[in-house]
Amino acid sequence: MLFLTKDLELIRKQLYEGVNLKMSDLSVEDLLDDINTDVMTPAWVCFDHEPSVIAENAYAGLLHEGRRVFEPRALKDGGFEVIVSGHRKGTGSSRETAPQCERWSGIRIVIAESFAPIHERNNLNLGQLMGDHSMLERLQDGERIPLTEFTEGYDPISKLILESGGILPFAKRLKSGEVTLPANDCGPRPMNMIEKMISSKLLGRGDEPGFVKPGDAVLAQVDGGYSHEFTTAQVHTFLSDEYGDDYALPKPSKFAVFEDHLLYATGVARFSRFESKIQTLRDMQVDFQRHTGVRDYSAVGGISPGICHQVAREEFIDVGDFIQATDSHTCMGGASNALSYGVGSTEYANLVHNQFSFVSVPESIRFKLVGELHPGCTAKDIILHILWKFAANSETLDRSMEFGGPGLASLSMDERATLCNLATECSAKTGICEPDDRTVEWLLDRRRDLTESQIRSRFVLPDEDAHYDGGTHEINLLDIRPMVAHPGNPDEGVPSDPTNGAYIDELGDVRIDIAYAGSCTAGKDDDFSFYAMVCEAALKAGLKVAEDVDCYIQFGSKSVKDLSERKGWTRIFEEAGVHLIDPGCGACIGAGPVSYTHLTLPTSIQV
């Protein structure tokens, strides 16, 4: 057993000097709290896709006096089967590599006082048993604890997944008839949008209508999804390992791969030692696409067709769809009245192969929009208001954010996409907009295979007396003012957090060095019309980008770039001194383009 103590030197002694500890000699307060997934597997570790290789650098981000506490292979070669920590294990990024580094190092039981929800789910999908410190003391006293004690706190389906050893072995048992799904006993009730969407996808019900309520654990049929080059290699590996090298996908036509995250990483100085691994990730995505026949959105001539979330909503997310993808901003699809959110690589491997996903029906919070925004205000200001007034109080936490009301009709589809995209910054499960005439018009403009009647027939609207655990909150758009997310001050304990909102007119003059516009949130048609409006006004006033400021604008997709050229916006940007960047996610994750590597801007999404 390995105890992750606040005394980091004591961890070293366990790893390298054979020191054995007992829980009875410690208290929970002696153990590390809030172990971040970036500590368990820093970003550079994620360039490896084989979990066994990832495990060689387990906890590479845990440093003491500038030196790694866990040297390479320390956990893997330590012979540990149980790992122990304090409160909130697995905070931060939802990366699945974090629990993978433990599982493939031989860890079979993870003990903590509490777990971050997504990290707990990732452990569950891998079949990792989780317990508390009282169970650990019993184990150390020689007691045998039955599996049922490790699973008793979970819903019936999660129990089956754990007992099966993870989501992929569970899917095999389900298909063979070795296990059966417990009946969902929810009777008829008024439902909100996410409840209706989930109830219409319940596995095994056919055309029979179903009902769900918050907290219900169900399996739901997935309509489509996508992955990108940072995650596809693992998906391909997991499916090959589980089903053999000749595995096939039953319905590849509505699944896709995108080359957008690492497109510009080659040449970035800090990634130079990982170039071969990055290329392997790219190559394996190509192999996966050719093997499965999913939609191919690879770069052509070094230029990506677009950022995955933008292209997906343009080309294949339909009203009422259930879409899952390996990225947290997948919820952008909710603008099209679809249910969409991000999942880990193992979950995605299961759903793309078996066409179902585990769903714990979330609670919902409704935002009723009234009035219209003032000129100069956008949907970004609405979501920053929600972050400040609601998310900061955890009112949106793990809930579905439902947007409706007469004010929604005044927002374009691109502005609605901004609202839904940023639901993840509110720590929400997803965001969903009510459909209307604008939904129909926007989709018909982009899909020759759809008709108005087909689109309207799939509309999902809440029942009039639907219940919202988070309440219904009216937001008068006339009250919204331009805002920014405060950059924070780590020296004073103020995090860089989008809930730290500030009104622009109260900031005074703030000197800037870099201006960036783009990302999945802000690289859409309407966003570019806003940028062009500002740049054109500047040019008319005899102004350009200041000499000591670098200004970048990045297209969200090829179609956005084409529109910019047709409208003359590209010429306006160039005359104003803006640097234009082809589509990609590099700026948000610090992965290039090479001349713009200082653009490590999560604020491109949040602000």
Show the residue positions of the predicted features.
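N-terminal, positively charged, Ser/Thr/Ala/Gly-biased leader segments
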Residues: 1-46, 183-208, 220, 224-228
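Long, structured ligand/cofactor-binding scaffold of large enzymes
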Residues: 38, 43-48, 52-53, 57, ...
